[in-house]
Amino acid sequence: MNGMRLVGIGDNATVLTQKARGEGRRNPFVSNSFKQANRLVLDLTYLFEAPGPGAIHRKDFDTLIPKAMEAHELLKENKGDIYDKGIPMTGWQDMPVRITKEHLSRIVESAQELASKIDAYVSLGIGGSYLGIEATIRALTHQYFNQLSKEARGGVPEIYFLGQNMDPDYFRDTLDMLDGKKVGINVISKSGTTTETAIGFRIMRRLLEENWGDRARELILVTTDPEKGALRRLAEQKGYNMFVVPDDIGGRFSVLSDVGLVGLAVAGIDIEEFVEGFKDMRERCMNDDFWSNPCLVHAVARHLAYQKGKKIEVVATNSTALYGVARWMEQLFPESEGHEGHGMWVSPALYSEKLHANGQMVQDGERNILETFLFLREHDNRVGIPMDEEDLDGLNFLPQNNLDMNFVNRMVVEGPAYAHYKGGVPCIVIEVPRRNAYNIGQIYYMMERSVAISGYLLGHNPFIQPGVEAYKKAMFALIGKPGFEDFKKEMERERLKRPRIKL
């Protein structure tokens, strides 16, 4: 039996876009027509007056706008509770206008040089040194990217991620995918001592050196502290090509820095277009007119929902490609807002898949939910629905009306938004016109500035994460890291006091 042929199915537009990038063809991202067609839209149609308890009213905005505008001015002036170890952590907000074409060119040249030598690229990092890179690549490439031919990938290597967890099976399975291939890596860590990433790097560095000896240094990029740290010392000793983790930008805000841009460039993504999206959203979010500023409106909408008793934010998308962006938001908001008993739990969801799982809870469960939709308006591909002579499933009305999967998938947002709103769930819709680097850049900047404003509204520093250090301290003690002996003894004493209950 022969293999299946895609009879009547057109070329995959995502693959065509990847090939175009590989040939140097670009979107006209500086043109006004492109920007108008790709303007991100914040839709509050289903936010106000949801039935039941905890409804948000327009007058609630009026009471909070003065405080939001004060936060807006403080943030613009780099004032307020924004410091980490004496450094103001707001370098991200002007990065779109500070980054130079020369620096972007250096990143692209280094990325292309490495990509030309390898079959597979491994990005090593965790948290903010991982999620934004993975989310952006996933958003802008074929969902089975590594299974495509190099030509279909646009001439770029396969892309893998390690150092983001400690699962030995995942790590070993990834090594199987790399076996027999020429591999390049980029290790991303400010200190070089982040446990998960450092262990992954140690293993990968040994493998590269075992295979290619001194030439391994040509296959290793390092993104780390500009002046100090264990990883910087090693990179200087070995002669690795280095990029910088900025001092004034925290990990979850770092996707526009070298942290994110190097990996995106290796994947063939147009980082100039990506920067342009950040830049244009920054311009909108510096606007002093509240209702013309999507970052301010978004921050106030979420804060009012929190004040009204919403403890869970479902971030749902109708796009598999954008699900990684929802996961990026899952770090950005809780790590910035989860202080002093504050904050909403962020739950990413892919619709319509999750509508057949937690959709019942959203519709009829406790009314402590805010729903945010990352709504992709136009997918890359238009997959037609064929007529069927028997029509046993009753779907012939779709092709009869020239309605395809793209249309049905749009209703996967519009239908649930209406139903959930009528069930008492306020909804925010962020309308993303198309899958391109410009739009992903817009989303990131809007979310970063929104969560910064949220920190001011909540009354705490959104740029630190002291709670994360608690798990690290306990883990270091348990694995026997030098310097944590006393804390390990304290943990053991505490554990002995507690009854061991195992079933």
Tell me what each language-model feature is:
Residues R106-D119, T174-V183, V300-K311, V362-R367, ...:
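Glycine-rich phosphate/diphosphate-binding loops that line cofactor/substrate pockets in enzymes
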Residues E109, P168-D176, A299-R302, F375, ...:
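Short, charged beta->alpha transition segments
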Residues Q112-D288, A477:
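Glycine-rich phosphate-binding loops that contact phosphosugars or nucleotide phosphates
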Residues I312, T320-V432, A437-Q442, E448-I479:
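C-terminal catalytic subdomain
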Residues M1-M4, A452:
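Short aromatic-glycine-(Arg/Gly/Cys) micro-motifs in beta-strand/loop hairpins
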Residues D11-V30:
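A short, charged, amphipathic alpha-helix used as a generic interaction element across diverse proteins
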Residues F34-Q112, E389-L395, P399, F487-L503:
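Extended, charge-enriched "interface" segments that sit outside catalytic cores
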Residues N211-E371, G467-L503:
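Active-site phosphate/pyrophosphate-binding segments
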